[in-house]
């Protein structure tokens, strides 16, 4: 087996232990790449904070607006990975260049609504009665970041879908790690005028992020096109309109799912804010901790997408079923261990964010530690649902999972959390139990759907 874990023939499906090893090998560089992206976001936040709360508020809100928009649109490009995996499994690698170039054109087209949305951030904020000065500064920030939209859709959206499917996930790893250093140097230099760079204040962070995103995209394109080992996957090929329709058909429900999940957490954060500064601070700490741990099952879900898709393409639904359920097991196992850490050492974790011995922090520390206990449960089902969603994408099954996610998050999760918070008197804890309930319902629906779909494929005459 190659480093990609995708070169076995359909006649020789792997054992369960080999499934686990290959999935972990594929997921590891993806997880580190995603953690590197989080590290860049943390760097931006810390350096913006050095300019004061106004700069931090404007830059942070502008960056969040940018990343929500491009992340949702990147969901459409997730279809590239399963299409490539299917083609490779079916020994139809001649289709891969067509998928790549069609995905490349799709990235360019998706950048258009991203640029439009980012250009409208100031009037949108004014429409929601945000302070005019804040709206103006956010508009200036996103006015720069809009030039990074295409780079992000290519360098993150397309490449993160394409490279793992051809066995080149490690390219993402090294480029992402390098991006941390480049981003930090450019951020500091452009914010404060260091290293001979112009002093741009808080807008320097937007310029630095834009440059880093484009450097990342160019580096990945160079590594992909410049290596003989992978060049045949991206040889000149004409994008195909029917293939464009196929990619959009698989990908748009994923984008909606990303949007539904993003709005759930956004609405929860806004609702926690009603409960006061202490509750909001505790919520942000717990959510940040959970977000770091989430990068691992997210990567496992991406690996499941590729591996399930490969074995479906190879005509072996039994191996595809095993690949999916082994990935689910890995995701649940990791998040269970992560949850155990949260239960055993909540105050030590909160101490990374706040001074535990400061009496002014006592209420926030207590609530944050309590939320981490809920997060221990929350994480397990969150990992299960994201891996299950990835496995279903490998089956090209995205529309029913989209409906399941919408129902689970907004039909169960938010209403339950709201009732527990304001009618049962649980406050922020109630909202977090609501999140856990919503994620648990989606996790069960995803796993059950994968079971039904693979059972049907196995039973079907071939």
UniProtKB/Swiss-Prot annotation:
Localization (cell): Cell inner membrane
Gene Ontology MF annotations: antiporter activity; xenobiotic transmembrane transporter activity
CDD domains, per the entry: MATE_NorM_like (cd13131)
Stored InterPro entries: MATE_fam, MATE_MdtK, MdtK-like
Keywords of this entry: Antibiotic resistance, Antiport, Cell inner membrane, Cell membrane, Ion transport, Membrane, Sodium, Sodium transport, Transmembrane, Transmembrane helix, Transport
Bilayer-spanning residue ranges: 56-76, 99-119, 147-167, 172-192, 202-222, 247-267, 280-300, 325-345, 361-381, 402-422, 430-450
A Pfam entry, by short name: MatE
Major localisation: membrane
GO BP terms: response to antibiotic; sodium ion transport
Membrane topology according to the record: Multi-pass membrane protein
GO CC annotation terms, alphabetical: plasma membrane
Family named by the database record: Belongs to the multi antimicrobial extrusion (MATE) (TC 2.A.66.1) family.
Role description: Multidrug efflux pump. Confers probably resistance to the cationic peptide polymyxin B (PMB).
NCBIfam families per the UniProt record, alphabetical: matE
Protein's UniProt name: Multidrug resistance protein NorM
């Amino acid at each position: 087996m190659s480093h990609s874990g995708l070169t076995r023939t359909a006649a020789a499906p792997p054992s369960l232990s080999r499934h686990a090893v290959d999935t972990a090998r594929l997921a590891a560089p993806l997880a580190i790449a995603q953690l590197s992206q989080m590290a860049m976001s943390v760097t931006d936040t810390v350096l913006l904070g050095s300019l004061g709360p106004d700069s931090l508020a404007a830059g942070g809100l502008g960056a969040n607006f940018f990343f929500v928009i491009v992340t949702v649109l990147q969901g459409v490009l997730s279809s590239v990975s399963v299409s490539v995996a299917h083609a490779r499994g079916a020994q139809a690698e001649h289709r891969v260049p067509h998928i790549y170039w069609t995905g490349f054109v799709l990235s360019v087209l998706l950048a258009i609504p991203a640029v439009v949305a980012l250009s409208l951030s100031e009037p949108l904020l004014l429409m929601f009665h945000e302070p005019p000065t804040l709206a103006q500064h956010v508009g200036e920030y996103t006015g720069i970041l809009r030039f990074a939209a295409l780079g992000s859709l290519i360098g993150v959206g397309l490449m993160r879908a394409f490279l793992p499917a051809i066995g080149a996930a490690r390219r993402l790893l090294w480029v992402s790690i390098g991006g941390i250093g480049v981003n930090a140097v450019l951020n500091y230099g452009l914010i404060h005028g260091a290293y001979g760079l112009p002093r741009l204040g808080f807008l320097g962070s937007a310029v630095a992020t834009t440059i880093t995103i484009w450097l990342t995209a160019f580096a990945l394109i160079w590594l992909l096109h410049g290596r003989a080992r992978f060049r045949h996957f991206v040889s000149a090929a004409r994008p195909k309109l029917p293939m464009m329709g196929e990619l959009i058909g698989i990908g748009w429900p994923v984008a909606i799912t990303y949007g539904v999940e993003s709005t759930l957490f956004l609405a929860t954060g806004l609702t926690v804010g009603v409960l006061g500064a202490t509750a909001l601070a505790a919520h942000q700490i717990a959510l940040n901790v959970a977000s770091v741990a989430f990068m691992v099952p997210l990567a496992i879900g991406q690996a499941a997408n590729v591996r399930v898709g490969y074995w479906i393409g190879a005509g072996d639904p039994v191996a595809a079923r095993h690949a999916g359920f082994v990935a689910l097991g890995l995701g649940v196992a990791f998040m269970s261990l992560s949850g155990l850490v949260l239960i055993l050492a909540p105050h030590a974790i909160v101490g990374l964010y706040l001074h535990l011995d400061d009496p002014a922090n006592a209420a926030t520390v207590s609530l944050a530690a309590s939320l981490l206990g809920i997060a221990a449960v929350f994480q397990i089902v969150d990992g299960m649902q994201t891996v299950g969603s990835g496995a279903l994408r490998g089956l090209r099954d995205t529309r029913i999972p989209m409906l399941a996610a919408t129902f689970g998050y907004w039909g169960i999760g938010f209403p339950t959390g709201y009732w527990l918070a304001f009618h049962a008197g649980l406050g922020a804890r109630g909202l977090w139990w609501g999140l856990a309930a919503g994620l648990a319902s989606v996790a069960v629906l995803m796993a059950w759907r994968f079971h039904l779909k693979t059972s049907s494929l196995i039973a079907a005459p071939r």
